[in-house]
UniProtKB/Swiss-Prot annotation:
Name of the protein: Small ribosomal subunit protein uS11
Function: Located on the platform of the 30S subunit, it bridges several disparate RNA helices of the 16S rRNA. Forms part of the Shine-Dalgarno cleft in the 70S ribosome.
Highest taxon above the source species: Bacteria
One annotated Gene Ontology cellular component of this protein: ribosome
Protein source organism: Bacteroides fragilis (strain ATCC 25285 / DSM 2151 / CCUG 4856 / JCM 11019 / LMG 10263 / NCTC 9343 / Onslow / VPI 2553 / EN-2)
Gene of this entry: rpsK
Family: Belongs to the universal ribosomal protein uS11 family.
Pfam families xrefs: Ribosomal_S11
PROSITE patterns reported in the protein's UniProt record: RIBOSOMAL_S11
GO MF, one example: structural constituent of ribosome
Keyword Cytoplasm: no
Amino acid sequence: MAKKTVAAKKRNVKVDANGQLHVHSSFNNIIVSLANSEGQIISWSSAGKMGFRGSKKNTPYAAQMAAQDCAKIAFDLGLRKVKAYVKGPGNGRESAIRTIHGAGIEVTEIIDVTPLPHNGCRPPKRRRV
């Protein structure tokens, strides 16, 4: 006789009009997350999730597509205003924020939260092409 499996219960996230936008832009990928005011994730997307591979993942167009996918879900759930938190040195940071604004979600402020070392780890060596 087969064991009964319990399906994982989907989390209920309370969505109000205000929220947070987190854009994590590394040298290899871009991750866009929209959260409510408590910080619980409403929707997320990344360039890799949208089907981009390799060096195409860190392009402004890939960031635009990821932000569009993320914003559509959150807008339908009722999110209207966000504070944008941008982290990382990669391309497409501004592109993602512009796309969110274009989708009907108002960006009230943009905060750069890129971690800066106080001379921590040695950076990777320069590429010789």
